[in-house]
């Protein structure tokens, strides 16, 4: 109930999680491989002196997991030693589990939050978004270098909001300053696996594909039919985004009434 812990920040949450694990005598600490989980869990693992497996896609044993490696081109098996296992789970890698009996919830007291954590909470409160987290969204619409400038992402934002999804971007678009870096999808950005991924004006560089090729359905829109993105797309449209996106927005609006 502490307001200072309302925002999921590593500086405030990691020490509290590590302390709770110690007091409970827990053998595992699990979380999602979202930007929040990837920020908090490694710090908690360090405070616990525990090993960690990130972005796991399968559980082999209590301390053994599978996770993607080499830009998603290989699957490696990792084993964590020690008495505590910390792991972040790729959300879309596991199907929903069958309902079971409700577990007991234990309420624990938390320690004091330092001044730095309190300041970061105040900053975080001004940066909330109405869209779902990029790593958890069922629909992701991403734009690439072909969008040319940041203001052109407005049309992608409109489509994104109509579909109830999250906005993403290629590294080229993020590096060019068109969008904030936290929207970057790829090997050095966010790894996503939504039900629907729409790639607009994205060439399909290997580092970008590593971050989205786990998507269930991939739609590519690009004016160049030779771009690599079409090799992984389930559906492709060869056209300019200036023509394709407004037309797609109009059709979605019709369907939504």
Which residue stretches match the model-derived regions?
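N-terminal glycine-rich FAD/FM-binding segment characteristic of electron-transfer flavoproteins
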Residues: 1-257
């Amino acid at each position: 109930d502490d307001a200072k812990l309302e925002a999921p920040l590593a500086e405030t949450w990691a020490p509290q999680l590590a302390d709770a694990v110690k007091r409970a005598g827990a053998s595992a600490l699990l979380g999602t491989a979202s930007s929040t989980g990837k920020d908090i869990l490694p710090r908690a693992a360090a405070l616990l002196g525990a090993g960690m497996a990130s972005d796991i896609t399968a559980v082999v044993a209590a301390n053994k997991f599978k996770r993607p490696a080499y830009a998603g081109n290989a699957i490696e098996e990792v084993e964590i030693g020690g008495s505590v296992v910390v792991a972040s789970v790729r959300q879309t890698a596991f199907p929903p589990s069958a309902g079971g009996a409700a577990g007991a919830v234990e309420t624990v007291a938390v320690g004091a939050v330092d001044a730095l954590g309190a300041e970061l909470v105040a900053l975080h409160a001004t940066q909330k978004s109405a869209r779902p987290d990029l790593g958890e969204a069922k629909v992701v619409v991403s734009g690439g270098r072909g969008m040319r400038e940041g203001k052109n992402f407005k049309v992608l934002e409109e489509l994104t909001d109509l579909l109830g999804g999250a906005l993403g971007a290629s590294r080229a678009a993020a590096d060019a300053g068109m969008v904030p870096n936290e929207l970057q999808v790829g090997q050095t950005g966010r790894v996503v696996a939504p039900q629907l991924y729409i790639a607009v004006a994205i060439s399909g560089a290997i580092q970008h594909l590593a971050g989205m090729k786990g998507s269930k359905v991939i739609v590519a829109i690009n004016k160049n039919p030779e771009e690599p993105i079409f090799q992984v797309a389930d559906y492709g449209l060869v056209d300019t985004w200036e023509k394709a996106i407004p037309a797609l927005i109009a059709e979605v609006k019709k369907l939504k009434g």
